A protein has these predicted regions:
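Membrane-embedded alpha-helical bundles that constitute the cytochrome b-like, heme-associated redox core
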Residues: 1-203
Length: 203
């Protein structure tokens, strides 16, 4: 069935090239895992003491860590794929400032997607109880902490644990803001400007 002239998918770029299937899969998988981790992080942070058993809290936190490491691995694959597979160009009618804004938002997203799990890994490695609480990726494979941090004295580790935790939290809020701008920009182009940019990233 042909699209009508009123369809938000009709425009000068209606036939725009799509991202590759691998890029689309990585994009939505990373997005889903990040949203899941946001929910798990909020559960761990906002639930009052005693709301969950120690075992349940440990499960939530360990799952949060496992997803974070998975996101880091997928982000590396995403960057490697992008470097070897040129993404489709933005529509020619986009003004320069929008092109620059889109590029800046993508760079910020990549930086934060790496910074979040890395800061979390550093935070976890500086935990004073890390040596007696091995980390297992989804309960299956033991994941190493960062050795030189674990070998520091307890006072230094406690200080670093707090600092890396604050950095992890700051990165999370920055990621929320950039994601909100990214989504708002995509919806603006789709529904107001009538450019079919969303279709490029749809499965």
């Amino acid at each position: 069935m042909p699209l009508s002239a009123e369809s938000p998918f009709v425009g000068a770029d209606a036939g725009a090239q799509k991202y590759t299937r691998v890029a689309v899969l990585l994009h939505w998988l990373i997005a889903l895992l990040i949203l899941t981790n946001v929910a798990l992080g909020l559960i761990a942070a906002l639930l009052p003491d005693g709301a969950l058993s120690d075992t349940a809290i440990r499960f939530v936190i360990d799952t949060h860590k496992s997803i974070g490491i998975t996101v880091l691995g997928l982000a590396i694959l995403r960057v490697l794929w992008r470097l070897t597979h040129r993404p489709p160009a933005l529509p020619a009618e986009f003004p320069g400032w929008e092109r620059a804004s889109a590029h800046a938002a993508h760079v910020a997203l990549y930086v934060l997607i790496f910074a979040m799990p890395l800061s979390g890994w550093l935070h976890d490695s500086a935990w004073v109880a890390a040596a007696s609480h091995p980390m297992y990726l989804f309960g299956l494979v033991q994941w190493p902490r960062i050795g030189f941090i674990m070998n520091l004295d307890a006072a230094t580790k406690e200080q670093l644990h707090n600092q890396f935790g604050a950095l992890h939290t700051a990165c999370s809020y920055a990621l929320y803001g950039v994601l909100a701008l990214h989504i708002a920009g995509a919806l603006k182009h789709q529904w107001i400007d009538r450019h079919s940019v969303l279709r490029r990233m749809m499965p």
